[in-house]
Amino acid sequence: MGPPPGIGVYCRGGCGAARLLAWCFLLALSPHAPGSRGAEAVWTAYLNVSWRVPHTGVNRTVWELSEEGVYGQDSPLEPVSGVLVPPDGPGALNACNPHTNFTVPTVWGSTVQVSWLALIQRGGGCTFADKIHLASERGASGAVIFNFPGTRNEVIPMSHPGAGDIVAIMIGNLKGTKILQSIQRGIQVTMVIEVGKKHGPWVNHYSIFFVSVSFFIITAATVGYFIFYSARRLRNARAQSRKQRQLKADAKKAIGKLQLRTLKQGDKEIGPDGDSCAVCIELYKPNDLVRILTCNHIFHKTCVDPWLLEHRTCPMCKCDILKALGIEVDVEDGSVSLQVPVSNEASNTASPHEEDSRSETASSGYASVQGADEPPLEEHAQSANENLQLVNHEANSVAVDVVPHVDNPTFEEDETPDQEAAVREIKS
């Protein structure tokens, strides 16, 4: 026997149960295995074939035992024996013509037919059931169907519903052709068919077990990953929520430290060239309560406080009020803390680049809103002298000009001539 395209086992000569077992394994996994019983199990058939060879007046019998047949899916599972008889005529091997006849030998010395088995070739345009039904009508005890030419010893499980009255098996083409040629040479061939082994259910049970275990493993892995992913997202969300709450608390603390001022009639912010709040884009009016940030920008208190609570930065220059006020902030996921101390001198000595950027974007300045709260000019001069002495001491070979800090360069033109003279004196 041998495998049909995609199914089966190729056998040569006395190939037996091992290859049939492999064929049954492929059959059990094949989606093309029809029939209720065939879908559950495949039964092999033991074949005991004998040739009675006349030789010099003495008959000699040659026996050949092998497991090379497969019971049809609708065939009775029982033993049967008889002389193999092909259909009459060279073109009738397929037994598709309902008028096909079989020449059955008789018992020696009588007209009683011997028990016989129909040897029929697969194909011809009719079904397995038609072939088996015809053999049963002609009186055969069983039907032996061999495969197409060119398929060697390949076999398939036959499905023949409605033709389950007699035993029906399939054998390979090479085996069937060999028997047919022997019969055509006048050799009487007898076959004894015995029920072989049942194959398939253990394969199905194993397949079900394997699929069940695989499904359980995949499901468990999927559920485990989903739980891990969900727990990780929940943990990150909680950490982010805690961080946001902490930052809001720090922002409230920082907002409480920022300076408030009530604008009065005559302040520069209210004059003809007065500024407007960068948040609400409205001009300042007398009695407006404004918040002065660490970067010297001012805004309406009601406008900037909600912004600072959420963003903690100046709406204009993005100056971080938490760092500017030295309030402890969390870095990344809260595992590291950073304390940024800021003194009055550090907050009042920004780099020239920062001063330039602020002067370009600021519409209001800390120096312009402090009014009567500005420190005396002498304090500015003294602070500038100290900075100049410190730089000259640290860099002896490098000439450094230190420009005294002005809170908002935008309003430098408002300085008095005395202040300009003091600055020139400091530079000299």
Curated annotation (Swiss-Prot):
PTM characteristics: Auto-ubiquitinated. Controls the development of T-cell clonal anergy by ubiquitination.
Cite the PROSITE patterns for this sequence. ZF_RING_2 (PS50089)
Q: Which reaction does it catalyse?
A: S-ubiquitinyl-[E2 ubiquitin-conjugating enzyme]-L-cysteine + [acceptor protein]-L-lysine = [E2 ubiquitin-conjugating enzyme]-L-cysteine + N(6)-ubiquitinyl-[acceptor protein]-L-lysine
* Region listing for Disordered, in residue ranges: 342-428
Q: What is its EC number?
A: 2.3.2.27
Tell me the CDD domains matching this sequence: PA_GRAIL_like, RING-H2_RNF128-like
SMART domains assigned: RING
Composition-biased stretches, type Polar residues, lie in 342-351
Any GO CC annotation of this UniProt entry: cytoskeleton
One Pfam match, by short name? PA
**Which sequence ranges are marked TM in the entry?**
208-228
Any idea which GO molecular function terms this record carries?
Answer: ubiquitin protein ligase activity; zinc ion binding
Glycan attachment sites: N48, N59, N101
Q: Which UniProt keywords apply?
A: Cytoplasm, Cytoskeleton, Glycoprotein, Membrane, Metal-binding, Signal, Transferase, Transmembrane, Transmembrane helix, Ubl conjugation, Ubl conjugation pathway, Zinc, Zinc-finger
Q: Which residues form the PA domain?
A: 75-183
Protein name from the UniProt record: E3 ubiquitin-protein ligase RNF128
**Organism annotation:** Mus musculus (Mouse)
Gene name of the record: Rnf128
